[in-house]
Structures are given as structure tokens and as C-alpha cells.
Swiss-Prot record:
Protein name, entry field: Inactive ribonuclease-like protein 9
Family: Belongs to the pancreatic ribonuclease family.
Listed Pfam families: RnaseA (PF00074)
One of the record's GO molecular function terms: nucleic acid binding
Disulfide bond residue pairs: C97-C152, C115-C167, C122-C129
Job of this protein: Does not exhibit any ribonuclease activity.
Segment forming the signal sequence: 1-26
Compartment(s) of residence: Secreted
Matching PANTHER family: INACTIVE RIBONUCLEASE-LIKE PROTEIN 9 (PTHR11437:SF14), RIBONUCLEASE (PTHR11437)
Domain of life, per lineage: Eukaryota
Keywords, in A-Z order: Disulfide bond, Glycoprotein, Secreted, Signal
Organism: Macaca nemestrina
Lineage, top ranks: Eukaryota, Metazoa, Chordata, Craniata, Vertebrata
Amino acid sequence: MMRTPITTHPLLLLLLLQQLLQPVQFQEVDTDFETPEDKMEEFREYLEEFRRTGPTRPPTKEKVERRVIIEPGMPLYHRDYCNEEIMRKNVYHKQRCVTEHYFLLMQYDELEKICYNRFVPCKNGVRKCNRSKGLVEGVYCNLTEAFKIPRCKYKSFYRRGYVLITCAWQNEIHKLIPHTINDLVEPPKHRSFLNEDGVFVIPP
């Protein structure tokens, strides 16, 4: 009978078994990559809001600016504007789609100044809002399908009008900041102007 080197040399067999029984060693992978601090803060805030079961945390300046303010880019008339921007900016309420949302093409500082304008009735006349003195371009998003993420579908409406907002006092910075965008009211098609009380007046 022919003998193999393993059967003729037991020591060789033991060495081979020793190699096979050693714990598997994985090569260490360098996963130390830098992430911008603002992106990490946004991600942590998103996870906290996503898991939160109690009342929604009051909005901060950074949150309002990130979710509402937009810059020139995709045409505001684009049919999928809301679907893409709401997903990109993580505009959700916990695990549900928001029923409506506004994107405004303006600087945050300009939006903040509206908090000190005259009061006018909000949409549906429920509360008092502050209204912008000038016209602002933006997009109104209205939920049409689904209620839970990620299946939210919106219809987009381009608007150019007066912004109605509610404001809240933020203790950390000791000033009023925009709280919610209540409406973006388009002016009448016919010629009109605003009087000192912020009311539309039609010339005779």
C-alpha cells in the first residue's frame, strides 16, 4: 500500500491541523473618514425626531433654514420638485409624510425679518400670522399619495406671493424665529396695492 507524506510523518499532520484550527484573522479596514459636522448634526437630529414618541421638538433656526429655504437650481415649475426636495431635505414628521409644505426662494435673514411685520389673519383665520412686505417665489407641496415614508407623493405648485408665517421665541438666541410657513398668498390678477394695514385695496 502506498503511503502519503501525511501518513508517514505524523508531525506534519499535527502542524497542518494547528494551522487550520487557528482563529480566522481579518485584515483591519480603515473606516476613519471625515464627515462634515453640520451633516452629522443633521443626521443625529433626524434620528432623534424619527424615534421620538412625545411632542415634536420646537424648530430651530438651523432646522427651518434647512427645510424651507432653497437656492436656485431645479426649475420651480418642475412637476417633481416637491418629491425630490422633500426627500433630499428629510421633511417628515416622525415616520409620516407631512400633508403640506412650502419651499421659499429667499435668504433666511429675510424670512426672519418677517417676524417683526404687522399681524394678519392666517390661512383659515385660525391664528395671527406675520406677512412679508414683498412678493416671494416658492413652491407649495400637497400630499396626494401614501402617509408613511418613503412612499410619500406630492403635487407641486409654483407660487409667487406674500409669505404668511408664525414665529416663536427662541431662548438660546433671545429672538423671534420663523416657526411655520402658513401660506404663500398670490396677489389678485387685477391691479391692486397694500395699504398701511397690510390689506389689499382695489383702486376705483
